C-alpha cells in the first residue's frame, strides 16, 4: 500500500463503505463489491493503476451487466491495450 496517496484514497473508500453505502440498497452486481475491489486494487497496484482498475470496474457495473465473481487481476492490464480482457485467467 506504499505511498500516502494510496492510503488517503483507501481511507476515503472506507468512509464511503462505512457511512454512505449503508444508506442505499446493495446495487453492485459483482463480488467483491466495487468499493472492496477498489481498495484491493489500490493496495496492490498503487494509487494510479489501482484507481484505473477501479474506474474500469465501476464502468462495467451497470444494470445490464451479468455480474458474478470478478477479482482484481493478478497482473495489471496495460491501459494502452484496451483489447486485453478485464481479468486475465489465472
From Swiss-Prot:
GO terms for cellular component: plasma membrane. The keyword Cell inner membrane applies. Its main location: membrane. It holds the Pfam family YidD. It is a peripheral membrane protein. It comes from the Bacteria. The keyword Cytoplasm does not apply. Keywords: Cell inner membrane, Cell membrane, Membrane. It is found in: Cell inner membrane. SMART domains: Haemolytic. InterPro entries: Membr_insert_effic_factor_YidD. Belongs to the UPF0161 family. PANTHER family: MEMBRANE PROTEIN INSERTION EFFICIENCY FACTOR-RELATED. Could be involved in insertion of integral membrane proteins into the membrane. This is Putative membrane protein insertion efficiency factor. The lineage of its organism: Bacteria, Bacillati, Cyanobacteriota, Cyanophyceae, Acaryochloridales.
Amino acid at each position: 500500500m506504499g505511498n500516502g496517496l494510496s492510503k488517503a484514497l483507501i481511507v476515503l473508500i472506507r468512509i464511503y463503505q462505512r457511512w454512505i453505502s449503508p444508506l442505499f440498497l446493495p446495487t453492485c452486481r459483482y463480488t467483491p463489491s466495487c468499493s472492496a475491489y477498489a481498495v484491493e486494487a489500490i493496495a496492490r497496484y498503487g494509487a494510479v493503476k489501482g484507481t484505473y482498475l477501479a474506474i474500469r470496474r465501476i464502468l462495467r457495473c451497470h444494470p445490464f451487466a451479468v455480474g458474478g465473481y470478478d477479482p482484481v487481476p493478478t497482473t495489471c492490464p496495460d491501459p494502452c491495450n484496451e483489447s486485453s480482457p478485464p481479468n486475465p485467467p489465472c
